[in-house]
């Protein structure tokens, strides 16, 4: 296991700054995910940790040692890429043995014919085979050892790529969008497998993805990164329920959080479209605000209830277990999404006028600068 710390890391390509004075501490054995949209600098940051890219300023520390000038091959980190990079002419077993042979055997011991006569070669090879066997049993790919990559499915290739990193027994695993090439169903399955592998190995995992579902389901902590900066670093639960800014709130969650124009008046009432929705939220400043509410925290109700507003259904999105109703509110000026169980909206149709209520305890309020006014981030 390894503790990894990034101090004041920045990276520029010519005049373009892609990482801006970034600090990040990763604990021993932690599974941390760096999540953000394409182009935010997350893969560049991972390459800096790996030693494949040099930072412009700042320090990378592994277990308290500055490794700025340490070659990638000497940092004892294992990387799994989006492209599995398996040798197509080698069997699975041979693919798994390659990194161990390079590390355990000397140049002469790897040399054809001459190496066969080196005195320690056999014992070293036996150790390599033993480690490959152990890794293949952990990943449940023992029955695939004699196959070549072209005979494997995408999920099987992904497991072999992880196994090739695993046999090295690195101090940390670096994973750069390893599930991006898989279909949706297999991706869900592999998320569970990688999480289970982390629990078994108890090794530090740094995982980069643009897929928020991967970040939310697998991480001990997740770092939301945009425009070269980490906007929030916290547990998945906290980031989903207490986003520090409106940008984080809109990025995390599917469907996206509903953001409505609101006002906090002199009497301490929070209003949307001129309708009082709550007086239980106390804010430091009066004036215009943005009100956030997630689709699952809204519901359709009868028109005789209080603190509700009217909308028109413009689209029904049926996902089987859930139905997402796309509505226009405030005379069509804004759109929102309401998540509901199918049995609750079975009689609704596009064009219907409906009444909506939301859970007051789940309301988020953001100021004009996009900062969350209703959480610990005040």
Where are these regions (language model features)?
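Non-catalytic connector elements of ABC transporters
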Residues: 267-378
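Conserved coupling/switch loops of ABC nucleotide-binding domains, chiefly the family-specific signature
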Residues: 56-59, 227
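The feature captures the beta-strand-to-loop junction immediately N-terminal to the Walker
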Residues: 35-37
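Conserved ABC transporter NBD signature motif
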Residues: 58-66
């Amino acid at each position: 296991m390894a503790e990894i710390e990034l101090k004041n890391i920045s990276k520029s390509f010519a005049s373009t700054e892609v990482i801006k004075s970034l600090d990040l501490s990763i604990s021993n054995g932690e599974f941390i995910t760096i999540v953000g949209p394409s182009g935010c600098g997350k893969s560049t940051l991972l390459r800096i940790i790996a030693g494949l890219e040099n930072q412009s300023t700042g320090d990378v520390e592994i277990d308290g040692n500055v490794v700025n000038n340490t070659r990638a091959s000497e940092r004892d980190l294992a990387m799994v890429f989006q492209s599995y990079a398996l040798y197509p002419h080698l069997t699975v077993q041979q693919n798994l043995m390659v990194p161990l042979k390079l590390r355990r055997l000397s140049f002469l011991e790897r040399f054809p014919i001459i190496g066969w006569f080196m005195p320690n070669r056999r014992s070293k090879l036996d150790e390599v085979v033993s480690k490959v066997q152990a890794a293949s049993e952990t990943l449940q790919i023992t029955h695939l050892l004699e196959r070549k990559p072209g005979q494997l499915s995408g999920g099987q290739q992904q497991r072999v790529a992880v196994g090739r990193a695993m046999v090295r027994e690195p101090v940390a695993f670096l994973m750069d969008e390893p599930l991006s090439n898989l279909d949706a169903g297999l991706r869900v399955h592999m998320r569970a497998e990688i999480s289970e592998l982390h629990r078994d190995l108890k090794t530090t995992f740094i995982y980069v993805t643009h897929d928020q579902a991967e970040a939310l389901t697998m991480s001990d902590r997740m770092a939301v990164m945009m425009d070269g900066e980490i906007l929030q670093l916290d547990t998945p639960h906290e980031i989903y329920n207490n986003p520090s800014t409106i940008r984080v709130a809109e990025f995390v969650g599917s469907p996206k959080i509903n953001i409505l124009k609101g006002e906090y008046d002199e009497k301490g009432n929070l209003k949307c479209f001129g309708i009082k929705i709550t007086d239980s939220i106390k804010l430091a400043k009066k004036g215009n605000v943005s009100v956030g509410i997630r689709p699952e925290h809204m519901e359709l109700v009868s028109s005789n209830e209080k603190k509700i507003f009217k909308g028109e259904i413009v689209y029904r999105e049926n996902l089987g277990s859930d139905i997402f109703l796309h509505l226009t509110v405030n005379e069509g000026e804004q759109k929102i999404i309401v998540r509901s169980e199918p049995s609750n909206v079975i009689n609704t149709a596009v064009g219907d006028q409906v009444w909506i209520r939301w859970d007051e305890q789940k309301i988020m309020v953001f100021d004009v600068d996009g900062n969350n006014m209703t959480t610990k981030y005040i």
